[in-house]
Amino acid sequence: MSNSNIHPTAVIAEGANLGKNVKIGPYCIIGAEVVLNDNVELKSHVVIEGITEIGENTIIYPFASIGQPPQILKYANERSSTIIGSNNTIREYVTVQAGSQGGGMITRIGNNNLFMVGVHVGHDCKIGNNVVFANYVSLAGHIEVGDYVIISGLSAVHQYARIGKYSMIGGLSPVGSDVIPFGLVSSKRAVLEGLNLIGMNRKGFDKAESLSALKAIKEIFSSEGNFAERIKQVAEKYKNNSIVMQIIDFLNQDSSRAFCHFEK
């Protein structure tokens, strides 16, 4: 391949196997047993070590780390590997760690996947094709993920779990069990618990007015009947309370999302 595709600050160990039209950006580090197939692009500051193969047309963004040893105490420098397929997009700060003796010695990722910022793929995971992992998804070791799975941001999956094909995991979800194919799972969403009275007091809001506003939001969100009508009634009842009126103004604005309510 042409040296013009390799930045002069990149460190490529002797023995690394680079395919056609591979592009390696500034300050990347490539180990001696790494295979980069045709048209792989490393943006900058990417570290790929161990026995690792990256499939063609895969793009890896800055500060990703691929092929490092598994994070397990019993790892004994066994020659495990990391195999990543073709047409993957691996964004900033993604970590993919090599397999271990207890898991078949291979961490394997398929084709056409998107790994957003900060995703962690633990040792011995087996990931299919066309999956999307949103920001900071974390997979422990030995996890199997089927094709076309979507895992939303900041979700974590327990070791040895199986995530069936075409399933979706909602954001901020701790997944400790298998997810059936086509399943939709999510953790409990945030609920309204009141007003930030301590913070309001620190910012100089009148205490009596704040407590009155707390009563007002309970009337809005906890009472029976039509929600829009309750907003109108509270707006009239508390029209001299500036805190309530700011809340009413917020409630009357157009939004693509629902409001957090008190837990029922």
From Swiss-Prot:
InterPro entries found in the cross-reference section: Acetyltransf_C, Acetyltransf_C_sf, Hexapep, Lipid_A_LpxA, Trimer_LpxA-like_sf
Keyword Transferase: yes
Assigned protein family: Belongs to the transferase hexapeptide repeat family. LpxA subfamily.
GO biological process, one term: lipid A biosynthetic process
Keyword terms of this UniProt record: Acyltransferase, Cytoplasm, Lipid A biosynthesis, Lipid biosynthesis, Lipid metabolism, Repeat, Transferase
Pathway: Glycolipid biosynthesis; lipid IV(A) biosynthesis; lipid IV(A) from (3R)-3-hydroxytetradecanoyl-[acyl-carrier-protein] and UDP-N-acetyl-alpha-D-glucosamine: step 1/6
GO function terms (MF aspect): acyl-[acyl-carrier-protein]-UDP-N-acetylglucosamine O-acyltransferase activity
Known function: Involved in the biosynthesis of lipid A, a phosphorylated glycolipid that anchors the lipopolysaccharide to the outer membrane of the cell.
GO cellular component terms, semicolon-separated: cytoplasm; membrane
Catalytic activity: a (3R)-hydroxyacyl-[ACP] + UDP-N-acetyl-alpha-D-glucosamine = a UDP-3-O-[(3R)-3-hydroxyacyl]-N-acetyl-alpha-D-glucosamine + holo-[ACP]
Cellular compartment(s): Cytoplasm
Subunit text: Homotrimer.
Record-listed E.C. numbers: 2.3.1.129
Cysteine pairs bridged by disulfides in the record: none
Family annotation (Pfam families): Acetyltransf_11, Hexapep
Superkingdom to which the source organism belongs: Bacteria
Protein name according to UniProt: Acyl-[acyl-carrier-protein]--UDP-N-acetylglucosamine O-acyltransferase
Predominant subcellular localization, coarse grouping: cytoplasm
